[in-house]
Amino acid sequence: MAETAYVPRLRTEYDRHIRTQLTEKFGYANVMQVPKLDKVVLNMGVGEAVNDRKKAEQAAADLSLIAGQKAVITYSRVAISTFKLRENQPIGCKVTLRQARMYEFIDRLITVALPRVRDFRGLNPKSFDGRGNYSLGIKEHIIFPEIDFDKTGESWGMDITVCTTARTDDEARALLTAFNFPFRQ
């Protein structure tokens, strides 16, 4: 007897309902034309890591907890004297999520993390890049339930980029709205 593979809740929702909604709305002739989520990139810039490498390692550990996947420390490519930055110094960390981890992260972001943001009024609907990708910034990474602020001691901001296969911003906005992204009216 074969075991059934785990499928994230949002992936099931996409396969059952969202794909048909988008096909009806935009009139796609082929199933492969329907936009879908491609990847989610989490980026955390840690300016204090220039002086203390442990800050970058702590940020990478926190980002790994949030993403459920090991974070990669990013290094500077050029020296900038005004920031006292030399080449190949740690300046942040990043994670790229795909497949099941991507759907799980988006589910946690929408249902758990964003409602914990202070004075949250909704996501900016103008943060699309013109090619169907959406970016948002978070000021404190402690809104995620995986992070214990008492152990971390610091809070860093992070950038979240949701990459889709949509060709236009309208298609991407319809896709993300179907996934219950809370856009401002």
From Swiss-Prot:
GO terms for cellular component: ribonucleoprotein complex; ribosome. Keywords: Ribonucleoprotein, Ribosomal protein, RNA-binding, rRNA-binding, tRNA-binding. InterPro entries: Ribosomal_uL5, Ribosomal_uL5_bac-type, Ribosomal_uL5_C, Ribosomal_uL5_CS, Ribosomal_uL5_dom_sf, Ribosomal_uL5_N. It holds the Pfam family Ribosomal_L5. Both N-terminus methionine truncation and retention have been observed for this protein. The keyword Ribonucleoprotein applies. One of its GO terms (molecular function) is tRNA binding. The keyword Ribosomal protein applies. GO terms for biological process: translation. It comes from the Bacteria. PROSITE patterns: RIBOSOMAL_L5. Part of the 50S ribosomal subunit; part of the 5S rRNA subcomplex. Contacts the 5S rRNA and the P site tRNA. Forms a bridge to the 30S subunit in the 70S ribosome. Belongs to the universal ribosomal protein uL5 family. This is one of the proteins that bind and probably mediate the attachment of the 5S RNA into the large ribosomal subunit, where it forms part of the central protuberance. In the 70S ribosome it contacts protein S13 of the 30S subunit (bridge B1b), connecting the 2 subunits; this bridge is implicated in subunit movement. Contacts the P site tRNA; the 5S rRNA and some of its associated proteins might help stabilize positioning of ribosome-bound tRNAs. This is Large ribosomal subunit protein uL5. It comes from Rhodopseudomonas palustris (strain ATCC BAA-98 / CGA009). The lineage of its organism: Bacteria, Pseudomonadati, Pseudomonadota, Alphaproteobacteria, Hyphomicrobiales.
